[in-house]
């Protein structure tokens, strides 16, 4: 289990733990996504992400978490949405799209806890995540449905000025 000595959990006014994550893609085609092994269950794959630090912006937290957990750097793209998990834990996760530009050979979690990473086709990643991390599978399903930077909500276009 991953435990950081100086980590402070942050919560929003509704009591949800504030988290940030990235769907890390090999290219802008967004057809291959990088998953990492779970710190609790090393034989299971997850989307890299974690808790936000106090005063940290969601995009900055997402980039930091991906660097720590997956050992990659990249170009932060759009916000895919804000996803809630209510079953076992109250989490609210900002999920971004990131195009990987640099892959480190050794990184923090590979050295400290033996974390692994692997590229998956999006369809295969959904299947792998579906059984034990369904909320992570939802991120990719939303992406496939044309997820846009509207914070997870559909937004109807505004009528032109003067229209009733």
Swiss-Prot record:
Which GO CC annotations does the UniProt entry carry?
A: cytoplasm; nucleus
The entry sums up its family as follows:
Belongs to the Nudix hydrolase family. DIPP subfamily.
- Name its co-factor(s): Mg(2+); Mn(2+)
Q: What name is this protein filed under?
A: Diphosphoinositol polyphosphate phosphohydrolase 3-beta
Q: Which residues bind substrate?
A: 9, 17-19, 38-40, 89-91, 115, 133
Q: Which organism is it from?
A: Bos taurus (Bovine)
Entry annotated with the keyword Transport: no
Q: Where is the active site?
A: 68 (proton acceptor)
